[in-house]
Regions:
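Bacterial N-terminal signal peptides that target proteins for export
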Residues: 1-11
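Early exported N-terminus immediately downstream of N-terminal targeting peptides
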Residues: 25-105
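Surface-exposed, polar/charged faces of alpha-helical domains
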Residues: 41, 45-51, 80-84, 111, ...
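Surface-exposed, charged secondary-structure patches
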Residues: 91, 99-142, 194-200
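Short beta-strand edge/turn micro-motifs at domain boundaries
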Residues: 141-169
């Protein structure tokens, strides 16, 4: 799967979680099921780029564990970063994901249908994979799976797996290559430059 396609489907994955009410007792699959119709309606009605960025910033952040995502994407390099570097990395990576998602949403059809599969969840479980099948007109159905963990504020996503390709693993390879070339500060500058380019 190309980077462009990965960005597009993870953009859809992000928006599928954007309208969940922050209810601690809600099962993770119910969070996804409860929002699909509203999300598809918004995609169909609103294609304004700025509005989609605002939507992602206001809604997506609440349902994604960006700190854990950043830790996983950095791998062993996370522990080598200083606290200020860790904060800068998390902030830059969060902005990168939000803007990537909002850009991808512009390409998503309002006729998308998402089938959510109930996970095998036992009492006391704090980690779960919620599997979904996305159907878009003119395309083969594809899988988007959410790795989620239970936090004090409810279930949060810490990885998105598209056709068996992990989002954080996908970023880890490019991040490690950049760190090898220019160090952690160099990686921060590269991510921030991408964010500025997307904003402009």
């Amino acid at each position: 799967m190309t980077a462009t396609m990965m960005a597009r489907v993870t953009g859809l994955a992000a928006l599928l979680l954007a309208f969940c009410a922050p209810a601690q007792e809600t099962a993770p699959d119910a969070l996804v099921k409860g929002l699909v119709n509203d999300v598809i309606e918004v995609i169909g009605q609103n294609k304004d780029s700025r509005a989609l960025v605002d939507l992602a910033e206001k809604k997506v952040i609440a349902h994604f564990d960006f700190k854990r995502m950043t830790q996983l994407a950095l791998g062993r390099s996370w522990s080598q970063a200083s606290p200020p570097q860790q904060q800068a990395l998390e902030r830059a990576f969060r902005t990168l994901l939000v803007r990537t998602y909002s850009t991808a949403l512009n390409q998503t059809s309002g006729r998308t249908r998402v089938d959510v599969k109930s996970p095998n969840l036992s009492p006391g479980d704090t980690e779960v994979m919620v599997r979904t099948v996305v159907n878009e007109p003119g395309r083969k159905p594809f899988n988007i799976d959410y790795r989620m963990s239970k936090a004090p504020g409810g279930w949060k996503v810490y990885d998105v797996v598209v056709e068996n390709l992990s989002l954080v693993t996908n970023y880890r390879g490019s991040f490690q290559s950049e760190i090898s070339r220019s160090g952690i500060d160099g990686l921060i500058k590269v991510i921030e430059a991408k964010n500025q380019k997307q904003e402009g």
